[in-house]
Amino acid sequence: LSVHSAIAQDVVEIFTEIYNDPEQFPIHDVGGYSWRGDTATGEHNCGTAIDINANENYQIRDGQVLAGSCWEPETNPYSISPDSSVVRIFAEHGWSWGGDAWAYSSDDSEGYHDYMHFSYLGE
């Protein structure tokens, strides 16, 4: 997992806490830094975002799936639920979860969710 060096230790602590949490949330796929071109300004381009279990935690806008294939937190152990230890632990470290409506979305933020995505907000 590649992330910005300024948050690397925080990321180690987060994943250690997730691993040691009684919930034992199963993680099989993790993504972080991803260069998306000189004009891209997204958090993955800067190394300040992480995606977990992308296939089971889709990105969706107004009912149209943009990435991944499902989000079934009640039946799929790899799907991240709002009350999961993963969301709680990231939040305790100052990160936001894409499962919440994105306040900075340029269009209807209520219709956009990215359940795989966590963004570093800082302190």
Spans of model-derived segments:
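Active-site acidic/histidine clusters and adjacent loop/turn architecture
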Residues: 1-31
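Second-shell loop/turn segments in exported
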Residues: 1-5, 39, 71-79
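Sec/Tat-exported extracytoplasmic proteins
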Residues: 15-22, 37, 56, 94, ...
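Residue-identity detector for threonine
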Residues: 16, 39-41, 48, 75
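Surface-exposed patches in mature extracellular/periplasmic domains of secreted proteins
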Residues: 22-41, 97-107
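Catalytic cores and adjacent binding grooves of peptidoglycan-active enzymes
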Residues: 46-123
